[in-house]
Curated annotation (Swiss-Prot):
Top-level enzyme category: transferase
Assigned keywords, A-Z: ATP-binding, Cytoplasm, Disulfide bond, Nucleotide-binding, RNA-binding, Transferase, tRNA processing, tRNA-binding
Family: Belongs to the MnmA/TRMU family.
HAMAP family linked to this entry: tRNA_thiouridyl_MnmA
Gene3D superfamilies: Adenine nucleotide alpha hydrolases-like domains, HUPs, Translation factors
Record protein name field: tRNA-specific 2-thiouridylase MnmA
Recorded catalytic activity of this chain's protein: S-sulfanyl-L-cysteinyl-[protein] + uridine(34) in tRNA + AH2 + ATP = 2-thiouridine(34) in tRNA + L-cysteinyl-[protein] + A + AMP + diphosphate + H(+)
Length: 385
């Protein structure tokens, strides 16, 4: 059974080996789920001085009564560690709710989890740790890994200049969450721990049971926190964006029907179009200015190029010449080979790249992330323009 930090402190009083050993202090982000719970427990077991931190994100969500907050607080009590809730509703509203809404209004398909990771979750955790002064590290339950640059010495990666800390895929390829972390900085990586990075999901559940964690049997959440809060992404959109009628038009120019807002559509969508045609049609593109949803045959959805903007180079120094990468253009897709070319003729030349795929790709979706890998190493990523 897991010993609490309270028990370990008593042990240390009688251990001559620990008299000169200084514990590292770490803040663990706790959602109340099994992954973050196990992360905290494993760090306690390894001898870290742990404090749990839960972000209060949603307006209309009480700080004392949501299931996640209650489970996080209970877990910390079980482990004998401190637990803190900080009110992050304003920054979440500004950086996630507002920006997600604006993206849908522009006809984009945003990635709220990435927005949250970049501007809310890790920022809030790191600032909290820094303000406490004696806390040096932060941790989350993400399935991803961090390595030092020496990791690449035996790899064929001569075309890249690596930074000190590298972000890697999680060992469990089915649970890997590195795609959502492409916006992290070296400062964050230097202080960040992923206790579950080397584990498989089934091992996580077994470990949680072994340690007797109260969240060990808790079902895994499959949805975005926005979906969990609003019930569906459709309800989120309806609450934040006014309907505006427009046309659904075939790419050949024929009007096939009407819609009540481009925010309800995404590139590649087939279901819910409400139109009649001899064979299945898919959303090809969204024209915000004309408020038109363009549809086409599936064969018309394929493209070999995309412009990637707001690129963040996580693990390597920004390349000045074209490089070969493995690009992932949606969370559950497999990475595909491509060439990334810096663009010199756009307003912000250091942040815009042309991505040319080796083979045609279907439904390249504006607003989603294109994340670049070399094997397991996440090089960087940006937004599909």
């Amino acid at each position: 059974m897991l010993k609490t930090q309270k028990d370990k402190k008593l042990e240390n009083c009688f251990s001559t080996n620990n008299k000169t050993k200084k514990k590292k202090n770490i803040i663990v982000g706790l959602s109340g789920g099994v992954d973050s719970s196990l992360s905290a427990a494993l760090l306690v077991e390894k001898g870290w001085n742990v404090e749990g931190l839960t972000l209060w994100l949603m307006k209309g969500q009480g700080s004392c009564c949501s299931e996640g907050l209650v489970d996080a607080a209970g877990l910390c009590e079980d482990l004998g560690i401190n637990h803190k809730i900080i009110d992050s509703r304003e920054i979440f509203e500004k950086e996630v709710i507002k920006k997600t809404t604006e993206s849908y209004e522009k006809g984009l398909t945003p990635l709220p989890c990435s927005m949250c990771n970049k501007n809310v979750k890790f920022e809030e955790m790191l600032n909290y740790a820094i303000n406490k002064k004696d806390f040096t590290h932060i941790a989350t339950g993400h399935y991803a890994r961090i390595k030092k640059s020496s990791y690449v010495e035996k790899l064929d990666c001569k075309s890249f200049v690596f930074k000190e800390f590298l972000l890697l895929r999680g060992a469990d390829e089915n649970k890997d969450q590195s795609y959502f972390l492409y916006s992290l900085s070296q400062e964050v990586l230097s202080r960040l721990e992923f206790p579950l990075g080397e584990m498989k999901k089934e091992e996580t559940r077994k470990e949680a049971l072994r340690l007797g964690l109260r969240t060990a049997q808790k079902p895994e959440s499959q949805d975005l926190c926005l979906v969990e809060h609003y019930g569906s992404m459709q309800r989120f959109i309806d609450k934040h964006i006014e309907p505006k009628e427009g046309e659904i038009m075939h790419v050949n120019g024929k009007v096939l029907g009407t819609h009540n807002g481009i925010q309800h559509f995404t590139v590649g969508q087939r279901k819910g179009l409400g139109i009649a045609w001899p064979k299945p049609l898919y959303v090809k593109s969204l024209d915000r200015g004309k408020n038109i949803v363009y549809v086409a045959d599936k064969s018309d959805l394929f493209n070999k190029e995309a412009i990637i903007s707001k690129v963040n180079w996580v693990s390597i120094v920004e390349p000045k010449q074209e490089i070969e990468v493995e690009a992932q253009i949606r969370y559950r897709s497999h990475p595909v080979k491509g060439t990334l070319i810096p663009l010199k003729n756009l307003d912000n030349p250091t942040k815009n790249f042309k991505l040319i795929f080796e083979e045609n790709q279907s439904s390249i979706t504006p607003g989603q992330a294109a994340v670049f890998y070399k094997g397991d190493i996440l090089l960087g990523g940006g937004l599909i323009n």
